[in-house]
Structure formats: C-alpha cells, structure tokens
Amino acid sequence: MSQTTPKGLHRLAFGGDYNPEQWPESVWQEDVRLMREAGVTMVSVGIFSWALLEPEPGRYDFGWLDRLLDLLHEHGVRVDLGTPTVAPPAWFYRAHPEALPVTAEGVRHSYGSRGAICHSSAAYRAAATGITTALARHYGSHPALALWHVHNEYGVPVSACYCDSCAAHFRRWLHEAHGSVEAVNEAWGTAFWGQHYSSYEEIDPPRVTPTVGNPAQQLDYRRFADATIRENFRAERDILHELAPGVPVTTNFMTALSQCDSIDYWAWGREVDLVTNDHYLMTDGRRTHVNLAMAADLTRSVAGGAPWLLLEHSTSGVNWQARNPAKRPGEMARNSLAHVARGSEGAMFFQWRQSRRGAEKFHSAMVPHGGTDTRIWREVVALGAGLEALEEVRGTRTVPDVAVIWDWHSWWAQNLEWRPNEAHDARERADSFYETLYDRHLTVDFAHPESDLSAYPLVVVPALYLMTEAAGRNLREYVENGGTLVVSYFSGIVDEHDAVHPGAYPGALRDVLGLTVEEWSPLLDDQRVRIDGPGGASLTGDVWTEFVRPRGAETVWTYADGPAAGGPAVTRHRLGRGTAWYVSTRLDAVSLDAIVAAAGEDAGIASRSGLPRDVEIVRRAGDGGRHYLFALNHSAEDAEVPLDVSGTELLADAAVGTAADTPDGTPLGTAVGTATGTPVGTPVDGKLTVPAGAVRVVRLDA
C-alpha cells in the first residue's frame, strides 16, 4: 500500500510554493532563515521549472535544485517536489507545435502562458515521461523529499483539446467505452437529426456546429477529456512509485465548484496517494467563509473522509479576479484553520515570496513585497505558531452530520444547451442547500449518488439532473432503510447518456418520491410564486414550477399562485422506515430553511438554533478517544458556544489583527487564541467565549 502522508513530516504542513529560480541564490539563505522564523515545515518546489531543469532535449541541469534541496534539508524543511509537466519549454513547442491545444472553434493556442497542452499528444507524453523519470532517479532517495507533486491544477486553464490527435484518441476511447459504432449510435441517439455513423472514422470531437451539437456526444467528450488527463497523471505517478517507493504522489485539485468544472474528482480521488487541494476566495458577493467550508468538505469527501492537505490558498488578495480585495486582519488564519477543522493536515500557500515579475506579481504571498515589517508577515508567523500548537490533531477525522449528493457528470450534462430554463444552475442549488445546512451548524459530507449512505440520517439532493438506475435504487434503499431524503427539482431526469428515463418525470426518482411530474413551467425573471403550508406559513419561490401529481406522497406545501396554483409544491413520502421530501421550485433562503428544518425533524437531528450565526463549529475525532472542537467566529460580535463537556484550549495567544492593524482602530480578534489572551492549556467548561474574528480549538475531555 502506498504512503498516504508526506514522508518524514511529523507536524502539520505549513509553507507554500517556493520558486527560488525567480531570485538570485543570495536570497536563498534569507529565505530559509525566515522559514525557520515562521515555523515553515514544507515547501513545494519545481512546479514550473522544466525549462531550467531540461534546457534542451535530454540534457538535464539539476545543479541548482541539488543545492536548494540540500539547503532546505539542512534547515529542517521538507520538500513537495513538482514534476514540471504543466509548463513544457519553448524548445518543446518549437519541435512539436502540434502539441499546442486547439479550441472547439479550431483556434490553436500559442506558447507564452502555462498549461497549453494537448493531453493526447504523443510527443508531450514522451517528454513528460523523460523529465519525470530523470527527476525520480535523481531525487527519489533525497532526504528532504516528502511528497511528489505531479503537474499543477489539471483541468485549468485548458480542459479539452479538439485537434486531430484528440479526434483519433477519442475514437479509440469510444470503442473502449461502448464496444461498437452501433452502441455509440444507440447511446447518442443519432437517429435524431440524421446523425447516424457507419464507422469510427466518421466521428469527430464536438467542434463548433451551426446549431446545438449532439448533447450525448458532448457529454462523452467531457468524460474523454477528463479520462485522457487522468491517463497522463497515472503515467507519471507510476514512474514515481517505481523509482521512488515510499514517497506519496499527489496532484493539486481545485474542488470548489467556483474554480473548476472539468474534472471528475470522485474518479481522481482514487488515483492519488494523498488528496490535496487549492482554494481561493471568490469576490462574487457570496459569504466567502461558506464557500471555503463547502470546498473543504467536498475535498475531504473526495478523500473518502480521510485527512487531506490544503496545498494552496492566499495570505491576502489574489490578482486574477475583476476586484481583488485584501483579507482583513485575522482572516487569513480563520481561512487556514477552517480548512484544518474540516480535515486538512496543514495550511500551504501560493506562494512563499511574492514575485517581482510575471502574471502573478500582485498575488499575495507569505513574504510580501514589503518584507517582514508588514501585517501579512506577522500573521504568517503567528499562524505558524498556532499550527505547531495544534500538532496533536494530526490523523484525526472531521465528524460529519449529513450528506449532500454531488456528481460532476450530472453537472456537465445539465450545463449543456437547450434546457428548460438557463437560470436553473446546479452549482447555485448546491451552494444554497449547503449554505442552509451550514447555517444550521451541520457538517456536510458530499457523496456520490451510488455510494453507501447508511451512515447519514439526512441526505440532500440539490441538483442531480443525470441519474443512473443504480443511483435511483441506492436512494430508494436508503429511504426504505430509515433515511430521510430531500430532493430538489429537475433531478432524476436523464440516464448516463443524457437520454430521458422512460415514463413520466422524474424517472429515476418516481418510486422513492411517490409522485410524477406531468410538466414543468419555468418562471420568467421577474416572476415569483407564493407557497402556502402548515399553520398558514408561506414560502417564496422563483425560477421554476412544476405540475406535480402525488402517487403516494402527501402534499405539505401548495402553490398559492403561479402556473401550478392549487397543486403540490413540496411533498413528503413515507417509504419503508424512512421519508422522502420533494421541492418543486427554487426557494429563497428563509423558505429553504423551513423545508430543511422539517426534514431534519424527520431525521431526528436535534436543532442547533442556539448557536450564533457565522460561528463555525466543527469537530475532529481520532483513535484513543481524541475529540477536538473548532470554533471560528466569522462575525463582528463576540460569541458564546455551549460545551457539553469540559476541555482544554490548545491555541497560544498569538495576537494578529489587533487594533493597531485595523484602519479604524477596532479590534477584529486574533488569528489564533483569543483577544483576551487565553494561555495554552487553559481549562474551559460549560461554555466557550469566542471573540469577534477569533478562532478557538478545544481538546474535549470525552
């Protein structure tokens, strides 16, 4: 069995992408001195260094990297060593211009950025094998080596190529996936619009067409592109396993739905030795700490509930959004420790030292342009001390309460053209249901539709347009065996080939929900509907309505107006020992909370309404009865959290975000510890006070 934790790293990981090739070697000594001051335990190296490591085909220059790894080892810093295959050198593209990717419109990308790769290119695969093999042979036994980091952020910025090499590869993939051209015709429904194929050679990638292309073909191409990238990862991984046994292999995911939509992370999670993730706050008006928690929960779920590692996030502002605000004092540590609460075994950043040149020179870093006399640096040092104080949580697992079903294949299918309402967004529904669960202080596991759900009292399906028959059976068995299920509209509609399930909607869910949908009637942008329910309570919906016909389900809320006035809007179906709820419109936040609360009662989940809003409460537990409570106060008010048992506060008084650092002189709390200076090991009992902006971590006594 492969190693699943960084080799030789016995603390929480703390550090970042280190790009010393951007600086004179005279700076390296200062770097390692500052790393020791900050408590850095690991850095990622060499991710974009292919042109320096292999300046011409087959000639390797590892001298500078030898000196660097020796220096890091001398100072006790572990190394996450990259295979630099995300950025082939200019000489490679000069020799193989066909390896540059082609868009669906037929435009070939040019050299001069990163990630410009056709993953079907035989020349690219051979070159990647060469540099990976050379690195593995040279550094496989280096004492600083803790982890292999293959490529970088697969799936962005290029998720698919449409060149002739990919066309040939796609045809081979289709034969492996379907077995025959006749099976492809059946799966794609090529009888529609006269698209029948007589041979594989007639099939091309779904390039630009006069109108909407075949949706099943487009869906298969998404699968093919993801599988092709995964083939290349496996090729590098297998080389590293063979030549450097005992060193785990990873690649950095981007699981946040706001940051990558082209990778099936359920499949990728099975390929890496250690799941790692990059996460960046999106300045799109959403509550960023909720998006962060969701990404962390999704990453942990991709890891099967096991500990994972945050490999990149930012100390402050980024540089690639329309507006890139700085993080407020204390926010960096709250972000970092929120990831740790939800299963990460540390907090790594992009990057160690802020670049003077290049596309990301305005992206924040651990060592900013202003050096060490800056708020960011002081917060970095404080966070390093805080992570050292939390070393004992290593190896524990986050404790979940409920599950949310998510499937990338369904997302891909729903995002294809010509759907009933383009305003129905799977990501928006997932975000909204997650936010409702978050505000009810429930920790979420994400789950594949065909996975074992028996551990969860409540399972939510926010958007599952594509559902296999196996997934439908799985959800039915879950409810029959005592589970509580909540399903949102436009779920269970098509099978794995984007073909509508036979019979009335929602085909894969009719039995478990006890209803059929005769027709849906999407709403216009300015339309709202009122929904009346128990005790005169009213809910509000928009975007979508349906004509629901109960077939065993009871009507709980009814449309009071709109196209489906008088008909069921929210239903409840008792099946076996469990209950299935169905929501046929897009509810606003208050209305959605009412449904989740009612379903939670069915599931026997105790209300946590006494906990304050925007105070994040998460537990980790491990062998030997170890239990830890993380309390992160994202609000501007001090908060009190009731404790069922006594415990011991673990974090030191590492003051960050004090009044001197804030523009208006108002304390925003501390990065770790508390504003009042709780010393390490202070007993707490009955309640835990968490100042505004602060983080507390308690070792519970039982």
How should each PLM-predicted stretch be described?
Residues 200-203, 207, 246, 273, ...:
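Carbohydrate-binding surfaces of carbohydrate-active enzymes
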Residues 16, 35, 43, 72, ...:
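Conserved, mostly hydrophobic/aromatic
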Residues 2-27, 32-42:
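An acidic-aromatic substrate-binding cleft motif
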Residues 13-25, 46-63, 110-129, 151-159, ...:
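The substrate-binding groove and active-site-proximal loops of carbohydrate-active enzymes
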Residues 9-14, 39-41, 73-79, 141-146, ...:
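Short, well-ordered coil/turn segments that N-cap beta-strands
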Residues 22-37, 128-134, 257-268, 328-336:
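Short, acidic/polar
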Residues 30-37, 42-108, 136, 235-243, ...:
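Aromatic-lined substrate-binding rim segments of carbohydrate-active enzymes
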